Amino acid sequence: MSDIKKAVLAYSGGLDTSVILKWLQDTYGCEIVTFTADLGQGEELEPARAKALQFGIKPENIFIDDLREEFVRDFVFPMFRANTIYEGEYLLGTSIARPLIAKRQIEIARLTGADAVSHGATGKGNDQVRFELGYYALEPGIKVIAPWREWDLLSREKLMAYAEKHGIPVEMKHKQGGSPYSMDANLLHISYEGRHLENPNAEAEESMWRWTVSPEKAPDAPEIIEIEFRAGDPVAIDGKAYKPHELLAELNRIGGKHGIGRLDLVENRFVGMKSRGCYETPGGTILLKAHRGIESITLDREVAHLKDDLMPRYASLIYNGLWWAPERLALQTLIDHTQQAVNGVVRLKLYKGSVSVISRDSANTLFDQNIATFDDDGGAYNQADAGGFIKLNALRMRIAETAKRKRAQK
């Protein structure tokens, strides 16, 4: 790919992507465009602009974009309409951010006339797959540079040596060994990987967690909140309307102080290995519980069961980087159709790491108290009808048992 003229780099301004920027300049000799996404990671992003300028990047080739609203509105909320969980635990905070970054990189490539894109994902992880499947889905002819699959800088020490050799500033934390974890954050979650977490038998240190208090140290009194949903998406907390990204940030704040959303798991990566990660997803944990609560009274039984059947497949598509694939888009159409009547208010109790639904109400409720009551229903439900229903559903099992007995007599 030596004929590359211009490349758009997903650039955080940190050590890894700063080394990549210099390496791209030296290895490919091409013009570089940097793109830094604000997904609510809580970091000051303007230093990335200053660092890019130090590398000689033209001011017009430096993009720092606030994507928080688009991220939550067009990616997080659609995913939560499906009650998406990967392997029974993971709420996909990293996975769902990658398709948006890839989308914006391709948009910038078109805007600037770039013929290539580049990312800082390693050759061992899922992110390389997520980024590149997105690139190719949105721009089939794009060229992709994945430095971690090309260079020999395969350790933190080699990265630092390269940085010092080329005058790339190395923060003191890296010189002293840095944070013991590889972290990734956005409005949905913060993740921790690496170092002693690579031993699945080692307990995560309490000092690692950044967004949530220890459940043991959370308030001794529970907090009750209300979340209003409209067409499957949350729109208000305690009667106050929020924009999507503001609502998720507020749920993170509320959940964090009650120790909600901590997770320590071993997951199966798409590339084949098992990986241990720790996550904090306070707002997402509350949102998932609330959404299932409002669906419990607004969704038809078979529709709800169908959604539950399809959800693991939908989750795997997102985890594996197939957000832009036709099968994910088809599933999204179905999921969104099911959400038309998912409107109403859910009340939840937050207490020392737990979140519980305590009430739910909707103008579209399918819960009929007159039928469900244990008291006299005035003939709304004829209990005698249940006998025939049971016999018909037992018919196939009765036939099977009768046939088994006949075989045993031969």
Curated annotation (Swiss-Prot):
Enzyme Commission identifier(s): 6.3.4.5
Catalyzed reactions: L-citrulline + L-aspartate + ATP = 2-(N(omega)-L-arginino)succinate + AMP + diphosphate + H(+)
Pathway: Amino-acid biosynthesis; L-arginine biosynthesis; L-arginine from L-ornithine and carbamoyl phosphate: step 2/3
PROSITE patterns hit by this protein: ARGININOSUCCIN_SYN_1, ARGININOSUCCIN_SYN_2
Main location: cytoplasm
List of residues binding L-aspartate: T122, N126, D127
Domain of life of the organism encoding this protein: Bacteria
Enzyme class per UniProt: ligase
Subcellular location: Cytoplasm
Binding-site residues for L-citrulline, renumbered to this chain: Y90, S95, N126, R130, S182, S191, E267, Y279
Entry keywords, A to Z: Amino-acid biosynthesis, Arginine biosynthesis, ATP-binding, Cytoplasm, Ligase, Nucleotide-binding
Record GO biological process: argininosuccinate metabolic process; L-arginine biosynthetic process; urea cycle
UniProt KW Metal-binding keyword: no
Gene Ontology molecular functions: argininosuccinate synthase activity; ATP binding
Binding residue positions for ATP: A10, Y11, S12, G13, G14, L15, D16, T17, S18, A37, G120
KW Metal-binding (keyword) present: no
Oligomeric form and interacting partners: Homotetramer.
HAMAP family according to UniProt: Arg_succ_synth_type1
Protein name: Argininosuccinate synthase
UniProt gene name: argG
